[in-house]
Amino acid sequence: MKAAGRLLGVLATACAALAVLASCAREDKNDRIVLGFSQIGAESEWRTANTESIKSAAATMGIDLRFADAQQKQENQIKAIRSFIAQRVDVIAFSPVVETGWDTVLQEAKAANIPVILTDRSVTADPSLFAGFIGSDFVEEGRKAGRWVVEKFKDGTDDVNIVELQGTVGAGPAIDRKKGFEEIIAANPRFKIIRSQSGDFTRTKGKEVMEAFLKAETRKIDVLYAHNDDMAIGAIQAIEEAGKRPGRDILIVSIDAVKGAFEAMIAGKLNVTIECNPLLGPQLMTSVTEIVAGRPIPKRIVVEEQVFPMETAKQHMQSRKY
């Protein structure tokens, strides 16, 4: 009987110790939120600023960030999300490289009871599969670019020939920025997009595609519309190498408003940039903490943004954070 009593005592002590350890583990997990984030890559100045904002905000708010760079490949993002599910992170967030093809992996996250937040770009999947989307209104960005072009040529009567450097094929910003721009210029038949091709949001590809436009096009090119600043900066080099003056012989409108664009505007080589704010880190981390606390977040969080013509570039340059 005494031996049995001692055994029961040992078991009780062991159980109590296990309970304490489990409690500590839960407290540690609750004290430090774990966020799995899949980034598209590092294809532009904008993306670099976006990544820095996310990492900085996570550190400031004490969130354990598990970061994965997809190198602009959807299959890498899907692998990363599945890895986050296996790790049982508290929240998953990602900037989708393209709009389609996410349903299966998002359903897997939902089945694991791990909420998902989309940043920068959205998807075409069932909205019930993600908690919310934080990012810009890409259609409106395209409209702003279109309005600037229409206003610039409002007093003329000649046709306005436009070449377009699109973003990554299938990416939300590329689809929406094209849609918004075309929506505005469609009202006036003078404005014609005579060539349009993907520059994949990169400086190198932007230069390459612009070189091809300049060699193949016999008509005068009046405007270059680039879906981001990096492609525009690459195209500027191609225009100069072709013996033309960017910003004068060919007017250039682009999107993002990174420092490189302001430098190009100050140099007179880029006419206007439409802001797309990459500093989404604080909003993302706030949303993550809200979700973990059991509070809902808005399904759509839109970032406010401005238009910066070259005439205002100098006065805004010093205050730019990216």
Where are these regions (language model features)?
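Hydrophobic alpha-helical
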Residues: 94-111, 181, 195, 199-263
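Hinge/cleft segment of the Venus flytrap/periplasmic-binding protein
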Residues: 165-173, 184-185, 276-322
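Hydrophobic alpha-helical segments within soluble ligand-binding/sensing domains
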Residues: 29, 35, 77, 134-159, ...
